[in-house]
Amino acid sequence: MGFKVITAPEKVNFELDTVYCFLAGGISDCEDWQKVTINFLKDFRYEPDESDLVILNPRRPEAVFNMREQIEWEFYNISACDIFSMYFPGGEHKREICMYELGRNLALGSRFPSRFIISVEDGYKRLYDVEVQSELVLGLDIVKEHMNPTLHAVDIYNRYKWIVNYGNAGNCRRSDRGGYRRGGYR
């Protein structure tokens, strides 16, 4: 298989030898950066003997949906992914929900700083907040500035390759790791 995309509200059946990446970040009042990132990721080479990369995309194709279902899908699946990728698009929007998700997931996953990819596009007004929050929780600055969806895709692919070569797919879904639970969204 190599590469697959699962879009909300599709059920996710987590498999141990697969690398999962959640595309957290802005959805309202911004370009469909998830689509750009996914299209770029499709072009990378995935070896048949390597773990598959599965992208969880919270952006639905339809505009009207059950908000509770969306929040639950994101809540459970973010915690179960190997890679938490957060993208802050530029512009005036403060992205309060994204800031909450970032803080929550940094706190839950602080023992696994390599799990995080945090990218900020030029023009995002709360860059300093993102940097300080990340540094306070993880003890290091992992925020990348001057990013775009294509560069974000490169970071995701590089992290995927690192997990395949040196890490352990499924590592964050073990029940003894900060409460993460195998199985994701129910």
PLM features: residue spans?
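Conserved catalytic or regulatory cores that recognize and/or transform ribose-phosphate-containing ligands
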Residues: M1-R186
